[in-house]
């Protein structure tokens, strides 16, 4: 797997030579644009260098990025308060370095934690790579393997120098742990990317992709198994409601177009040509992420669909009707809100328009429906009233320009947040 790195310093995406903040090789102002492009290729790795160096933070920017993209976040996480804050912002996982102790890590689910093994000459260093710990990499990995799901290994003396990474050291770490290993620092060539993938390690790429020495698209292409279907790969296409909407095929060129443009491109086996979804129908696909399976021979496109995905006029998906769920309802409410607020709406007194424009109406309905849910006694009554509460909750979110995805990220953050130490939990 590939994790494009976004290192933040002073609100910019930067790359430092040797981790030295006074030797900045790359500085990009448009962090959001970089993130959108990178996110199509893999889950982002966001590193707050200011926090790591103890000279401020980039929390507002990180919150914005985590609201839009899947990301793991690290840099300066030296307190439970900061860890909790990042999880609530939507970080999928936390990268912990300086505070990677059993006591600190045990407060969180292991599947939400990555331990940073930053090494100089085999010794683990912390505090922004400025302090030696006396611990060796393999010893630290053995000590902490039960408290995390991944290790992020960086030979810091190779970081940003474009001189290649330490494949032998990474192979030793992969062999020594059952945890997933992500390699960073000095990766500069496609053979290295492929070698790491073959040994079971992922790549966190920084300097090489910012300077153009490596292309993220080339990296993805190189890891895939193109030999099973005459140079083609099957693609499962999934919309923002997580409904599978179609199955298609790509060759290298179609995949490259997709990754470069963010539009769904495919290869037609019957017509023997490339095609872009929506080129005649207007029912386009915005590709948010391209992911590949464990065998590297099947792709998943996560998309935002405009109109129908299927060529049959009566079907939304090539597999049938659009699935109804809370996101479907949310989309309908957002559409109704836009219509209700249009200046030329004909039905100014409609109930829908009132819900989105009349102060206090949604809040009053929520209070009423919550009370009825509390009083509901039979299974049927409980389901009925719960549906009303959900409807008006989604209406309130839509009225304020908020989404169900934001609520889900909040719940996901709470799920991964700190647990009380065992000694303080008391008897249940």
Enumerate the language-model features and the residues they cover:
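Conserved anion-binding
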Residues: 8-23, 84-159
């Amino acid at each position: 797997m590939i994790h494009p790195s976004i290192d933040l310093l002073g609100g910019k995406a930067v790359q430092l030579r040797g981790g030295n903040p006074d030797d900045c090789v790359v500085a990009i102002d448009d962090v959001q644009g970089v993130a959108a492009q990178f996110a199509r290729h893999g889950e982002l790795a966001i590193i707050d260098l200011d926090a790591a160096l103890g000279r401020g933070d980039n929390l507002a920017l990180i919150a914005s990025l985590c609201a839009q993209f899947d990301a793991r976040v690290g840099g300066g996480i030296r307190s439970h308060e900061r860890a909790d804050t990042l999880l609530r912002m939507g970080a999928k996982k936390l990268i912990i370095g300086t505070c990677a102790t059993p006591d600190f890590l045990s407060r969180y689910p292991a599947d939400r934690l990555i331990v940073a093994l930053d090494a100089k000459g085999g010794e683990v260093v912390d505090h922004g790579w400025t302090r030696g710990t006396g611990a060796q990499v393999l010893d630290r990995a053995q000590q902490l393997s039960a408290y995390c799901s991944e290790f992020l290994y960086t030979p810091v003396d190779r970081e940003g120098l474009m001189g290649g990474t330490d494949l032998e050291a990474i192979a030793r770490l992969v062999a020594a742990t059952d945890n997933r290993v992500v390699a960073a620092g000095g990766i500069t060539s496609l053979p290295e990317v492929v070698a790491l993938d073959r040994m079971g390690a992922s790549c966190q790429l920084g300097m090489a992709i910012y300077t153009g020495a490596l292309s993220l698209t080339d990296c993805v292409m190189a890891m895939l198994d193109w030999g099973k279907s005459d140079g083609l790969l099957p693609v499962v296409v999934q919309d923002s409601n997580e409904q599978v909407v179609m199955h298609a095929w790509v060759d290298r060129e179609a995949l490259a177009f997709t990754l470069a443009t963010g539009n769904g491109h495919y290869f037609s086996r019957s017509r023997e040509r490339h095609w872009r979804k929506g080129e005649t129908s207007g029912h386009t696909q915005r590709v948010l992420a391209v992911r590949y399976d464990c065998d590297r021979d099947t792709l998943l496109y996560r998309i935002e669909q405009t109109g129908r995905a299927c060529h049959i006029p009566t079907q939304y998906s090539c597999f049938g009707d659009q699935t109804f769920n809370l996101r479907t309802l949310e989309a309908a409410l957002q559409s109704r809100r836009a219509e209700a607020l249009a200046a030329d709406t004909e039905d100014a007194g409609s109930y829908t328009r009132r819900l989105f424009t009349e102060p206090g109406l949604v809040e009053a309905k929520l209070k009423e429906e919550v009370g009825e849910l509390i009083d509901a006694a039979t299974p049927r009554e409980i389901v009925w009233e719960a549906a009303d509460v959900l409807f008006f909750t989604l209406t309130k979110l839509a009225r304020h320009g908020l989404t169900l995805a934001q609520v889900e990220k909040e719940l996901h953050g709470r799920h991964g947040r700190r647990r009380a130490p065992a000694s303080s939990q008391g008897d249940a």
